[in-house]
């Protein structure tokens, strides 16, 4: 009997221990579910904040355990906030949606990471009318080193900046819709064309002279498109380029920057100057930058090459640029772009 009693007690203790071991697991599930079901407590606020992270996600349910609906694709955008909770901001809108508080902040908080600076929609080279893509995953880092710099660094470089474009726009004036460009061997005639059922729109503007390489710079405007091109002052030969050109101080390279044909973020291209007489260039690479856009036409925030051979650019996140590009006194960001040695 004594042995039977001991066995019974031992079995009873084992059963109790088993119950105690399994019970917390059940309780943890209940607690976890309860936590998930806890609602965020929102309080009304009135403020504006930027999307500071390029990985920000949009939520239709303010629950950190729920799956977000989709990526925002609004890096640098400014939103009105109508309420906030511990983890979320409620965006002022006609429908309910939310952003994580960690993804929102002031303009100064916008996070231009290495990935943000270098990422592209696509990158490659035009061969005739075909664009040949680089290997998947290639970014601007293959060709350039891009660093964020301060306003003070930008201004210091600007004092010794290289500005080879002479904007003598009064020297060559359009008359009755016609631009006449005097060259050593010929006269180049560019005539505006009005939009009609038979003809597409064509408008040409003289932007100045790139004296070190003896080229006129012309802007062409067409129906839903535009371009820049060079006219040789000696031969009258036309050289097509991607967008606005910036000649390096040593005259060996041209980088072009400008908004894309679709009005998106900045297009960048690198050319090697093969010869000045006769003038010839070779496209090294062309890309559409994903997240940021240059203030290409800004008078107070010009793009230029410094004496160190780097390109200095005033820029912004695409959505910030759309707010600020008409206001020269608004703050912006600055980058320094260096051509990698293997392409020099």
Q: Where are the model-predicted features located?
A:
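C-terminal motif of bacterial Sec signal peptides marking the signal peptidase cleavage site
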Residues: 14-15
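Boundary regions of SH3-family modules and the immediately adjacent low-complexity/disordered segments
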Residues: 24-42, 92-134
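Beta-loop motif signature
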Residues: 26-88, 123, 182-195
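Solvent-exposed N-terminal domain segments of exported/luminal and surface proteins
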Residues: 106-199
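Surface-exposed loop/turn elements that mediate protein-protein interactions on large endomembrane-trafficking
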Residues: 177-196, 223-240, 269-288, 326-344
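Repeated scaffold domains used in trafficking and secretory/extracellular systems
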Residues: 198-206, 241-250, 291-302
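Blade-terminus and WD-like Trp-Asp/Gly-His loop motifs, strongest in beta-propeller folds
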Residues: 207-212, 245-256, 302-311
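Beta-strand C-termini and the immediately following turn/loop, strongest in propeller blades
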Residues: 218-223, 256-262, 267, 313-319
């Amino acid at each position: 009997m004594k042995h039977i009693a001991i066995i019974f007690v031992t079995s009873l203790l084992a059963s109790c221990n088993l119950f105690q071991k399994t019970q917390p697991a059940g309780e943890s599930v209940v607690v976890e579910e309860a936590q998930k079901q806890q609602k965020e407590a929102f309080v009304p606020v009135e403020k504006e904040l930027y999307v500071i992270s390029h990985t920000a996600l949009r939520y239709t349910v303010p629950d950190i355990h729920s799956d977000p609906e989709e990526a925002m694709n609004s890096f640098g955008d400014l939103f009105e906030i109508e309420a906030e909770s511990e983890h979320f901001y409620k965006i002022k809108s006609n429908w309910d949606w939310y952003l994580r508080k960690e993804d929102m902040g002031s303009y100064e908080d916008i996070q231009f990471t290495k990935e943000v600076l270098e990422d592209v929609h696509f990158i490659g080279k035009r061969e005739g009318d075909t664009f040949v893509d680089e290997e998947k995953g290639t970014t601007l880092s293959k060709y350039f080193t891009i660093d964020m710099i301060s306003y003070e660094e930008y201004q210091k470089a600007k004092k010794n900046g290289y500005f080879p474009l002479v904007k003598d726009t009064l020297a060559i004036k359009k008359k009755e819709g016609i631009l006449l460009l005097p060259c050593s061997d010929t006269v180049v005639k560019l005539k505006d064309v009005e939009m009609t059922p038979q003809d597409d729109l064509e408008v040409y503007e003289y932007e100045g002279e790139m004296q070190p390489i003896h080229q006129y710079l012309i802007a062409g405007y067409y129906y839903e498109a535009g371009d820049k091109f060079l006219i040789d002052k000696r031969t009258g030969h036309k050289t097509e380029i991607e967008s606005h050109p910036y000649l390096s101080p040593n005259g060996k390279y041209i980088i072009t920057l400008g908004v894309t044909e679709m009005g998106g973020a900045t297009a960048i291209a690198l050319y090697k100057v093969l010869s000045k007489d006769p003038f010839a260039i070779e496209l090294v690479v062309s890309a559409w930058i994903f997240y940021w856009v240059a203030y290409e036409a800004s008078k107070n925030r010009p793009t230029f090459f410094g004496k160190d051979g780097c390109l200095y650019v005033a820029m912004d996140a695409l959505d910030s640029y759309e707010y600020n590009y008409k206001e020269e006194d608004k703050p912006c960001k600055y980058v320094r772009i260096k051509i990698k040695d293997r392409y020099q």
